[in-house]
Amino acid sequence: GPESSREVHDAIELLNAERIGHGIHIINDVPVMDLCQEKNVTLEICPTSNWLTSAVPTTAKHPIKRLMNYGVPVTINSDDPSLFGIDLCHEYEILHREHGFTEKDFHACNQRAANASFIDATEKARVWRNL
């Protein structure tokens, strides 16, 4: 809700956050989406976790594709695999089946994840070569 968007805004503006875990409620706050886009702040999206914690009513209604289409940088994540019993392949399957994600979409999210990682540029280049 509005509090969540405000927290994302404050994390970016006051704490200089470069990545935000979850943060999907900014879909209803255009200025915060603009801020993420402008400052290149990446949202770490966890579709199944967002559904299981009632942040979204179903995985099919998850706003990830709308966030991407708006230009908000996002990555695909599995949150806590041991708690939720899922892995990244599970998230990919859901996004492909329910949101029409293509190989190009997954590639873009993986590129974003590599770029947004906190490792140095040399290590990023090595990791990306192996993807």
Model-inferred region functions:
Residues 1-55:
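Active-site core of metal-dependent hydrolases
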Residues 47-53, 75-77, 93-98:
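Short beta-alpha connecting loops at secondary-structure transitions
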Residues 90, 100-131:
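Mid-to-C-terminal alpha-helical segments outside catalytic/metal-binding sites
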